[in-house]
UniProtKB/Swiss-Prot annotation:
SUPFAM superfamilies: PE/PPE dimer-like
Lineage top rank: taxon: Bacteria
Single Gene Ontology BP annotation: response to host immune response
UniProt-listed PANTHER family: GLUTAMINE-RICH PROTEIN 2 (PTHR46766:SF1)
Lineage: Bacteria, Bacillati, Actinomycetota, Actinomycetes, Mycobacteriales
UniProt gene name: PPE30
InterPro entries: PPE_C (IPR022171), PPE_dom (IPR000030), PPE_sf (IPR038332)
Protein name, entry field: Uncharacterized PPE family protein PPE30
Family per similarity comment: Belongs to the mycobacterial PPE family.
Length: 463
């Protein structure tokens, strides 16, 4: 542009009409800040790469460093270019300020033009010719000044706007990397599946040959661990002896176990502490074994010796002596089915065959023995006893009636603990009965004489 052909009004007006140097100075500051950030980032990248390559060596670390190094170099170069741009912007702002200062202010140009117009208007007789020439001379100076300022500004700004072009950042990734990664993953999956199948095949083959290779494996292991070449032979010999010993011990164990099992079952069946379970013996077997008939004409005493309850004199059951306390603590003779002449042992309630019932454990033992052995048992006088039972004496009278006896038996079955037992011989029976008539309650008199025991109940009720 030829600024010399333009009047000062245009040149000065354009120079004063713009925003000034403020935007250019702001741009210079921005470029300078960008240069600082880029330089700092490049330094950080470089330090990280140096640390990684120091502790991480290999092909991967080399590839990573090679990919990051160009980017670090680009950031450093871009930082320098940004700093150069900042300097150029600052130079452009300085050129503007210089041109602005050299330009004639528009009001001065306007005043000169106004003065010239007044002189020309009043120059009727030529008296203002000199003043008009002076005004024109000053205006020409303004023209030259503005033209010179604009030419200078154009030259300075053209130099300031010359900056090095910025380069695009280099790529840090491979465009074909995703495809390559997909192929690598597929190959890895295929190789993994093949390895898994191979491993399964090897495991199955090992399991299939484990039994046949056991001796060889153990022998090799023992020889390797002990360092003795014949350690496996010693082990196999000892193992053979162990198997042979087990073959001899097992039959003996079976015999001992069978014997102990039988003893335990026998103890459980005849244990006087554990309540007897009547379900273990069929009712038909009990009835057939005892041989109870409707008449109940004979007692168990004919097949077993009497139980003696004398002081310091042990009782006996067959050839076995029993403690004297058995007769008092668990009497072997208790009324159970005296008046039920039409029934056998099946009529005895199941609940009565337990400890504290009319049949004690001792009596139940004899019942079980009779059932299993098939020995005949007899009861006389309507009472079941371990010795011979005699008829109730005539002096009892009403007590011998069936109704009365049934009531007494029912009471004894409900409350067997209320029965009072008395022991005497035949000579002292009359005196004992006379004494018991005066005492209330239910009394059972046990008679003992020689090898027999006679028992007669007496019932005395108050009221």
């Amino acid at each position: 542009m030829d600024f010399g052909v333009l009047p000062p009004e245009i040149n000065s007006g354009r120079m004063y009409a713009g925003p000034g140097s403020g935007p250019m100075l702001a741009a210079a500051a921005a470029w300078d800040g960008l240069a600082t950030e880029l330089q700092s980032t490049a330094a950080d990248y470089g330090s990280v790469i140096s640390v990684l390559t120091g502790v991480w060596s290999g092909q991967s670390s080399g590839t990573m460093a090679a990919a990051a190094a160009p980017y670090v170099a680009w950031m450093s170069a871009t930082a320098a270019l940004a700093r150069e741009a900042a300097a150029q912007a600052s130079a452009a702002a300085a050129a503007y300020e210089a041109a602005f200062a050299a330009t004639v202010p528009p009001p001065v140009v306007a005043a000169n033009r106004a003065e010239l117009a007044v002189l020309a208007a009043t120059n009727i007789f030529g008296q203002n010719t000199g003043a008009i020439a002076a005004a024109e001379a000053r205006y020409a100076e303004m023209w030259a000044q503005d033209a010179a300022a604009m030419y200078g500004y154009a030259g300075s700004s053209s130099v300031a706007t010359q900056v090095t072009p910025f380069a695009a950042p280099p790529p840090t990734t491979n465009a074909a990397g995703l495809a390559t990664q997909g192929v690598a993953v597929a190959q890895a999956v295929g190789a993994s599946a093949g390895n898994a199948r191979s491993l399964v095949s090897e495991v199955l083959e090992f399991l299939a040959t484990a039994g046949t290779n056991y001796n060889k494996t153990v022998a090799s292991l023992m020889n390797a661990v002990t360092g003795v070449p014949y350690a496996s032979s010693v082990y196999n010999s000892m193992l053979g002896l162990g198997f042979a010993e087990s073959k001899m011990v097992l039959p003996a164990n079976d015999t001992v176990i069978s014997t102990i099992f039988g003893m335990v079952q026998f103890q459980k069946f005849f244990n006087p502490v554990t309540p007897f379970n009547p379900d273990l013996i069929p009712k038909s077997a009990l009835g057939a074994g005892l041989g109870l008939r409707s008449a109940i004409s004979s007692g168990l005493g004919s097949t077993a010796p009497a139980i003696s309850a004398g002081a310091s004199q042990a009782g006996s059951v067959g050839g076995m002596s029993v403690p004297p306390s058995w007769a008092a603590a668990t009497p072997a003779i208790r009324t159970v089915a005296a008046v039920f002449s039409s029934t056998g042992l099946q009529a005895v309630p199941a609940a009565a065959i337990s400890e504290g019932s009319l049949l004690s454990q001792m009596a139940l033992a004899s019942v079980a023995g009779g059932a299993l052995g098939g020995a005949a048992a007899r009861a006389t006088g309507g009472f079941l006893g371990g010795g011979r039972v005699t008829a109730v004496k005539k002096s009892l009278k009403d007590s011998d009636s069936p109704d009365k006896l049934r009531r007494v038996v029912a009471h004894m079955m409900e409350k067997p603990e209320s029965v009072q037992h008395w022991h005497t011989d035949e000579d002292g029976l009359d005196d004992l009965l006379a004494e018991l008539k005066k005492k209330p309650g239910i009394h059972a008199v046990h008679m003992a004489g020689g090898n027999k025991a006679e028992i007669a109940p007496t019932i005395s009720e108050s009221g």
